[in-house]
Amino acid sequence: MEVENVSVTFGSGATAVEAVKNCSLTLHEGEPIGIVGESGSGKSTLARVMAGLQPPSAGQIRFRGDNVFKGNKSFQSGNRNQVQMVFQDPYGSLNPQLNGLSAVAEAVRIHSKVGKDEAEQKALELLERMGIGKLDALKKPRQLSGGQRQRVSVARALSASPTVLLADEPTSAIDQSAQAQLLKLFLGLLNDGLSIVLVSHDLGVIRYLTKRVYVMKDGVFVESGDTETVFNDPQEDYTKMLLASIPGELGKAARAKLKR
């Protein structure tokens, strides 16, 4: 996937807000990359554009050579299922009237055009892979923990057999134990060849999972590169400021660089 000089503007005239400004990036097959920045930096808007959910005001997204947005449609040549997204609030993205099994089975039927029994069997397999057993699979979203809801959301996304998964702040609304489970799950998906774009303000999560990182401020990429290089030798003051907020040696080193 290539993001080429993408900008996104909301509104017009004097009230126009440019949320994303001339951003470019490349995502390789089977690669984990991170987009990091504070709230309001534009990272979630860019993720929605990459997922085909928000058209850019300028620039283009290319997936396997095709322009994702063409006219009023997104993802030409049957590539719609290949890029999926999970959101920060799993409760808001799940139908409150459906239990986990039904929610995932519904997605399986949409993407695979199979019968009810086959869809439920596939859904059970996906949920079990996510660490959701049959008893929990029969619970509705309000009966599940935040971490369980997020894993049901991931199972729904995987029902399309995607090659790219965009995850927008997937760990921000869950506890530390659930975060660890979800990150372990993502590592397994990477081992299976899935490409992951992790959007987060949590630098620890970004460092744990990604190989390359893009640092975003006010809609602009201010720094990018190999994750370890950016974290250990940041060049931009904004990146240093973000890193300085981390407890421990990495944050201490970043704070020292800010004082220079």
Residue ranges and their predicted role:
Residues G59-K70:
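Conserved ABC transporter NBD signature motif
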Residues I206-Y208:
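A short, surface-exposed alpha-helical micro-motif characterized by mixed small hydrophobic
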Residues A51:
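Helix-to-loop junction immediately C-terminal to a conserved catalytic motif
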Residues E118-L135, L243-A244:
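Conserved ABC ATPase "signature" region
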